Curated annotation (Swiss-Prot):
This is Probable 2-phosphosulfolactate phosphatase. Keywords: Hydrolase, Magnesium. Gene3D superfamilies: ComB-like. The lineage of its organism: Bacteria, Bacillati, Cyanobacteriota, Cyanophyceae, Synechococcales. GO terms for molecular function: 2-phosphosulfolactate phosphatase activity; magnesium ion binding; sulfopyruvate decarboxylase activity. The gene is comB.
Length: 243
């Protein structure tokens, strides 16, 4: 398996066509996606564009849909939920389709929506995603960080490193190779692996969340390692379901 990590979607050349892709947005889209599907959401339908989201959601029964949206860390006006994993409990999301648009994560998903095997990962479902990749054994894997408005984010690289670490444990070094970005992410993970929440709070986006309110529960949820068996997987363009 050739593992390539791209800090942000724009770093991934248009000519790169991997066998599989994993999108990461630790704070907080892919963490929220994993928890929502774990808690019984029917699906997550991701949109880079809010107008397109509203059009698609309007065609869905009102009692079977939720609008989930965030810009700049704040819930979008008129939406049911913001981008917080602690708000997607089973009593809220079970059986419903979540129409979701966020500052960074859903845009990253849009960039790789044509990849044959597309999943999302966060720290809580790191092990489950690693096992699924080990099972499928793609020749080439692109791990795509969401970043923040096109810039590098520490927390996405932390989770990328955590995933690379587990993949290299599952596959011998002779069967796996990583690009420099993935190797650097692995080193970052080894630095913070015993206290990932501290890394999330140190990150620029973590500091941004701290400034706009009390997000202690979000930090704890986003930093929880290997808690979920859910692997959000794209079945049709833009639609993720538990697998």
């Amino acid at each position: 398996m050739q593992i390539s990590y791209f800090h942000v979607p724009a770093e991934m050349p248009q000519s790169v066509r991997p066998s599989a892709a994993v999108v990461i947005d630790v704070l907080r889209a892919t963490t929220t996606i994993a928890w929502a599907l774990h808690n019984g959401a029917e699906a997550i339908q991701a949109f880079a564009d809010v107008d397109a989201l509203h059009t698609a959601a309007a065609a869905w029964p009102a009692d079977a849909r939720l609008l989930v949206g965030e810009r700049g860390g704040q819930k979008l006006e008129g939406f049911d939920l913001g981008n917080s994993p602690v708000t997607v409990g089973p009593e809220t999301v079970a059986g419903k389709r979540l129409f979701m648009s966020t500052t960074n994560g859903t845009r990253a998903l849009d960039r790789v929506r044509d990849v044959p095997l597309l999943m999302t990962a966060a720290l809580p479902n790191r092990e489950a995603v690693a096992q699924r990749l080990h099972q499928h054994k793609p020749d080439t894997l692109a791990i795509v960080g969401s970043g923040w408005e096109g810039s590098y984010s520490l927390e996405d690289s932390l989770a990328a490193g955590a995933l690379v670490h587990r993949l290299l444990e599952l596959d011998s070094a002779a069967n796996a190779a990583a690009n420099d970005e993935a190797t650097a992410a692995l080193a970052l993970w080894k630095q913070w692996m015993h206290d990932p929440e501290a890394c999330l709070r140190t990150a620029t986006h973590g500091q941004r969340l701290i400034r706009i309110g009390n997000h202690d529960a979000d930090f704890q949820c986003c930093a929880g390692l290997d808690q979920l068996s859910t692997v959000p997987t794209q079945g049709e363009p833009g639609v993720l379901k538990a697998a």
